[in-house]
Amino acid sequence: MKRKNLSSGWGSLALTLVMAVGLAGCGSDGTDGIDGKDGVNGAGQVISMQRLGRTASQGFDQSAAEIVAFEPAGKNIFAVNAQSGMIDVFSAADPTAPTLAQSIDLRTLLVANGKATDVALVGAANSVAVHGSFAAVAVEASPKTGAGWVVFLNVDSLAYVTAVQVGSLPDMLTFTPDGSKVVVAIEGEPEDYTVDPEGSVDIITVADFSLQRAGFREFNVGGSRAAELPAEVRVFGQIVDSNGQWVRASTVAEDVEPEYLAISADSQTAYVSLQENNAVAVVDLANARISKIFALGFKDHRLPGNELDVSDKDNQINIANWPVFGMFQPDSIATYRVNGIDYIVTANEGDSRADWGIAQSGGATDFAGDSLNLNMEEFRVKDLPLDPDAFSDAASLQEKAQLGRLKVSAQMGDTDNDGDFDELYVYGGRSFSIWNAATGERVFDSGSQMELLTANKYGTNFNNDNDENDADGRSDAKGPEPEGL
């Protein structure tokens, strides 16, 4: 999923000061690992944050302060002003009153330095990271299916250093902890599925700005590593013609869409979320090679502790168990090490391919009977034929106060291929999870805590749609929609 607006409705950039760090109500942590020491009782500790300063971003409702990076030596904040193709630099020398120091037009810089022929061919800025002397910015092309760029700026002078051309839709980037490389998640998101660019992880060596690419072609059908791709990795993209008619299935390399990445402390390994594919790729950075791909599996919302609210039209908080499965589909991820074991943390946001053209072989008709050349991925439960053996109470389940309004994937769930749905799969886990980075085993999931805690604090304003300020407005989609860590 392309980066979304993470700024507030006022389009402002806010600084916060963490006053105390801890986990509320944790109790004793016990023993960590085989040789770990006893944990510290954290029952009385809380997290408390207080806003220290605030400044208006450069544009209202335009993703104008979407991603930020702090440069400590100069006390500057680099903010991605996404749709304008700008980087806004704010001085935080006085953190109580940050001020705009400079806006850098990346489109003009790319043209002036011979990296692009016209500003119209340069799209949005998607990500920024800072390390040492450099700020690196991911910039997509226009259209986004073209090759994008990583622009390097000097953090002291804010001058252009160079730009490296990368794959289609560089969605997120970060420096390795040692600062030797910039690693870029190349999402390769299609515009309308007439073209589906390949996803990849692009690796730039900072010393000489050389580029290596870790791609996924070996996992294609017939590829040398096709057998290594777990069966539960979701691969279902399709190439269509200009009329939206099915031409062929996308390859694995075309279908995977690297979303976000985290780097191990030793700067040797990248962990990359493949959001739409419900998977994580592990990348050997030294050799620019995909080491393995983990399928993340599914969350059983029938189980105690995995409750969710599924309707935006029931005028109430109704966090309960329902006969659906959640696809974790993380956006941002992080990594850390405890007692020699590496772990991955995921924010299980979820994402569908509802806004891109997906036709079906032999014709395009949705389950409600309407002609359809777009959106063969996301449907509401009320519009799907449910298997009467799997759902004996299908008629009541499809009412709007129950599962009827819930958005699910039509690309999976017909387990016996008889044209109706035996299982229902929703987008996202409405949670965060911790995974063993070596095995891909899930060792923790926060279950229904996000919805329970926000409902307790905000009442029916939980699962709010920030665009419309609509209470309970996201319960039919991805609920609290955790995106960042």
Residue spans of the language-model regions?
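Collagen/collagen-like triple-helix recognition
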Residues: 27-42
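Bacterial N-terminal signal peptides that target proteins for export
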Residues: 2-14
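Initiator methionine at the very start of the polypeptide chain
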Residues: 1-2, 337
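C-terminal motif of bacterial Sec signal peptides marking the signal peptidase cleavage site
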Residues: 22-25
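Beta-sheet-rich non-transmembrane sensory/scaffold domains
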Residues: 27, 43-484
